[in-house]
Regions:
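A binding-site-centric feature that preferentially detects glycan-recognition modules on secreted/surface proteins
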Residues: 1-166, 172-241
Length: 241
């Protein structure tokens, strides 16, 4: 962890006020390309219930002092992370981002087929999301709260949190962006790179994937992290219903 931060990279200071549950649900309806079993009222109720439970737990309630981005992961027919990201999440993100920012776009810099290329990092608890997504839609909240952490440091944080938390991965990060495409948009400041904290390249522990702003576009890419921390590298936690 970087112990002294310049706070050079940050989210829009007004982003919390821009989170609109009705608009988020509408974006999922419009861009996922599949019918959701959960309706809008149920989605809103589930998010409010998650927030209420967090606020009642003194050990974790401070996380709500930051910003959390609600998401829905659709029911998936495959456990192949790369295929799902390629075929379901990225097309929806491309449409949602262009709908919000007509002059900018989402760009995928990964030119190879992602199928069978992504794996779960040990002790990330992400197997909970993979297994649950095969049976039902998942509602939760993404908290990009581990600013300037390394992968090992993010894993250490998770060890001390209740089981309902997981290290965030591509499903929630991309889903949160589909719902709130302005999540990493700020015309005045630089916003951070978000690692898929629970994921790695299938063959190399030191390579992972991330969403990164570039100008006013957002991009998907991979890189080696070597278990280091950097001021523009952020990790995230997700909490599920």
């Amino acid at each position: 962890v970087n112990k002294k931060s310049r706070y050079y990279f940050s989210l829009d200071e007004n982003i919390k006020q821009k989170i609109d549950l009705n608009k988020i649900y509408s974006n999922y309806q419009n861009f996922y390309g599949t019918k959701l079993n959960i309706n809008q009222d149920e989605f809103i109720e589930k998010i409010k219930e998650i927030q209420k439970k967090i606020n009642l737990d003194d050990k974790i309630k401070n996380i709500n002092e930051g910003v959390g981005f609600p998401f829905i992961i659709p029911k998936l027919s495959s456990a192949d992370i790369g295929s799902n990201i390629k075929n379901i999440f990225l097309p929806a993100l491309k449409k949602s981002y262009k709908n919000k920012f007509q002059n900018y776009e989402f760009i995928n810099h990964i030119k190879f087929d992602l199928s069978n290329k992504l794996d779960i990092r040990k002790e990330s608890r992400y197997e909970n999301i993979i297994s649950k997504s095969l049976n039902e839609e998942i509602v939760g909240i993404l908290y990009p709260c581990l600013n300037e952490y390394s992968f090992p440091a993010a894993h250490e944080v998770l060890k001390n949190l209740p089981e309902k938390f997981v290290l965030s991965g591509g499903y929630e990060i991309i889903s949160a962006l589909i719902g709130t495409p302005e999540m990493l948009f700020d015309k005045d400041k630089y916003t951070p790179l978000l690692w898929f904290s629970s994921m790695k390249n299938f063959d190399d522990e030191n390579i992972s994937y991330h969403i990164e702003p570039y100008g006013y576009n957002i991009t998907l890419n991979e890189r080696a992290h070597l278990n280091q921390a950097a001021e523009y590298w952020w990790h995230s936690l997700s909490i599920l219903e």
